[in-house]
């Protein structure tokens, strides 16, 4: 059986990166919520 998690920087950035978040209304909500909370990092590394 193959491992379920295969890390890939590009794929990760495309799905949960800053630019990906800015593309959708929901993503913008996520960013604004994290700004409101005072998060040091708006996106997960």
From Swiss-Prot:
<dbReference type="Pfam" id="PF00468">
    <property type="entry name" value="Ribosomal_L34"/>
</dbReference>
<dbReference type="GO" id="GO:0003735">
    <property type="term" value="F:structural constituent of ribosome"/>
</dbReference>
<comment type="similarity">
    <text>Belongs to the bacterial ribosomal protein bL34 family.</text>
</comment>
<dbReference type="GO" id="GO:0005840">
    <property type="term" value="C:ribosome"/>
</dbReference>
<dbReference type="InterPro" id="IPR000271">
    <property type="entry name" value="Ribosomal_bL34"/>
</dbReference>
<protein>
    <recommendedName>
        <fullName>Large ribosomal subunit protein bL34</fullName>
    </recommendedName>
</protein>
<feature type="region of interest" description="Disordered">
    <location>
        <begin position="23"/>
        <end position="45"/>
    </location>
</feature>
<keyword id="KW-0689">Ribosomal protein</keyword>
<feature type="compositionally biased region" description="Basic residues">
    <location>
        <begin position="31"/>
        <end position="45"/>
    </location>
</feature>
<keyword id="KW-0687">Ribonucleoprotein</keyword>
<dbReference type="GO" id="GO:1990904">
    <property type="term" value="C:ribonucleoprotein complex"/>
</dbReference>
<dbReference type="GO" id="GO:0006412">
    <property type="term" value="P:translation"/>
</dbReference>
């Amino acid at each position: 059986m193959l491992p379920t998690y295969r890390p890939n920087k590009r794929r990760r950035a495309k799905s949960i990166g800053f630019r990906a978040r800015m593309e959708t209304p929901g993503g913008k909500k996520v960013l604004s919520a994290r700004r409101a909370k005072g998060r040091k990092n708006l996106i997960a590394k």
